Amino acid sequence: MEKVDTSGRLSKLRELMRAHSIDVYVVPSEDSHSSEYIAACDARREFISGFSGSAGCAVITLDKAALATDGRYFNQASKQLDHNWLLLKQGLQDVPTWQDWSAEQSAGGKIVAVDPELIAAAAAKKLAAKIHKFGGSELVALERNLVDVVWGKDRPDRPRNPVVILDTAFSGKNVETKLRDLRQELVKKDSLGMVVSMLDEVAWLLNLRGSDIPYNPVFFSYAVITLDTATLFVDDTKLHPDSLEYLRKNGIVTKPYSCIFDDVKALTSSKGVQGREKRTLLSSKASWALKRALGGDDLVEEVRSFIGDAKAVKNEAELAGMRACHIRDGIALIEYFAWLEDQLVAKRIVLDEVEAADKLEELRQKQENYVGLSFDTISSTGANAAVIHYKPERGSCPAIDPEAIYLCDSGAQYLDGTTDVTRTVHFGCPTAAEKLAYTLVLKGNIALDSAIFPKGTTGFALDCLARQHLWREGLDYRHGTGHGVGSYLNVHEGPIGIGTRVQFAEVSLASGNVVSIEPGFYEDGAFGIRIENLAIVREVQTQHSFGDKPYLGFEHVTMAPYCKNLIDISILTTAEKEWLNAHNTDIFNKTKDAFKDDALTLAWLTRETQPI
């Protein structure tokens, strides 16, 4: 990972800050739609800081610069940030949040500015209150993005890729039904309508997909839904005649993407039940710019999105697709690991991290309904595996060492579902420490996968099940244990998750959710271990039903064996061995027929799924 010299960029930015009488400038990671993963044209924080991770916030003053990020990226950020930057390791004791650091730098009535399109309205409100309380300072919405000015002509163009229709056979619910369900919620809230700004929510609601953001099948758009109208704000160059006709048949009007702010201003308040003013609903993740355009607190009600909640609970067609695509994805993974071992060990061929990742992509491309990858493949050998979101660079990454840990975190987009899986393997003789760490992580994975819990339980409450065996050894990991996953949509999907963050205590898991289970352990400079499966949350039968509550459990859908070479069988319980054997039998039975004419892969699969 090479450092970028940001001195010139920061100097130009500070000149602009002085010209606008700004003392502190905040550069978030997100785009205008609060997207975690963004198009190249929206990578402003990366451009100004040199840090390429998916999460973080840059704060620049007239003489300092700080980059805040979470535990997934401490290692990466320390390697990528140059001498101009202070790294704020969020979540560590005595390290201020970027909001607190901004407030400290603004003390004394200074001006803090941010592009209002790039920060959620709720986040802007909290930041404004914090800096005002700290030193009487003011948060200013600066609509001219100063990083864009510094970037200039080198800034990439905004993608204008075509929009495609997702067949109801895959979505499981037509647009008419989804709009009806949303309008029922609008009636319950006695609201004028809802502005939909999250890209995956627009795509899900209208059964459309795109490719404007790498690995995420979404397209730049907004939607405004009222009780009797539906408007899609999108560049018309994206819409082919079939898409236009599809939208027309479903009563959806199209307008240019750039018209959203002017149009929402026309959504005026009217009297509702009991004579109160009707408000327009806005997701709690929507931008400050949208809220300002709608008229502020008096005319807007921020809510947890009904669409996000509905999207997270997959219907039976989506769940069937998830099961099916994971079997096909598992076939590609099994073929990959068998091939990789043969290349590295039997044939002693030298392969680097990118060459291996390319082979895995090639194998996935052969599978039915394949569209593309769901994120950059993390193909990492040895110490690189300790970089949680490592990205190998073509032409400069190391060769895979068969005598070291190899971690591969990968996934794909299929028309019938989205996959995300991590397997950690060792083709040689692992150390006792590596085997212990791997087995502790495996035990945590099994513990969470086996959990049964009452309806209403949150991912926050379940998180410790995955960490318990590491904790007993004084070990842990600095990332969440699980995230929601879309159905041929974003690989990271809210509002659910499993982890220690506050938001995971706010939304309980529900039958139909798809979530990852991915404990890990990372020894900086040495090795990293992560084991990740996707699982469907399902109602389970229990002998009793205390409080008349249904009970839930997990149905794992990932079909890839664990690394037997890294398992210390002596510390597995009988129940854990039984779970592992049942899991391996399931994998073998669902994938073996694909290898009838592939003796090498079938032999590898048979060996790796033998009972222990």
From Swiss-Prot:
Keyword presence, Hydrolase: yes
Function: Catalyzes the removal of a penultimate prolyl residue from the N-termini of peptides.
GO cellular component, one term: cytoplasm
Cofactor annotation comment: Binds 2 manganese ions per subunit.
Enzyme kind, highest EC tier: hydrolase
Pfam family membership, one: Peptidase_M24
Keywords: Aminopeptidase, Hydrolase, Manganese, Metal-binding, Metalloprotease, Protease
Binding sites annotated in the UniProt record for Mn(2+) 1: 420, 518, 532
Entry's EC annotation: 3.4.11.9
Binding of Mn(2+) 2, residues: 409, 420, 532
Gene Ontology terms for molecular function: metal ion binding; metalloaminopeptidase activity
Family annotation (PROSITE patterns): PROLINE_PEPTIDASE
Protein name: Probable Xaa-Pro aminopeptidase P
GO biological process, one term: proteolysis
Cofactor(s) required for function per UniProt: Mn(2+)
Reaction it catalyzes: Release of any N-terminal amino acid, including proline, that is linked to proline, even from a dipeptide or tripeptide
Coiled coil start-end: none
Similarity comment: family membership: Belongs to the peptidase M24B family.
UniProt keyword Manganese, yes or no: yes
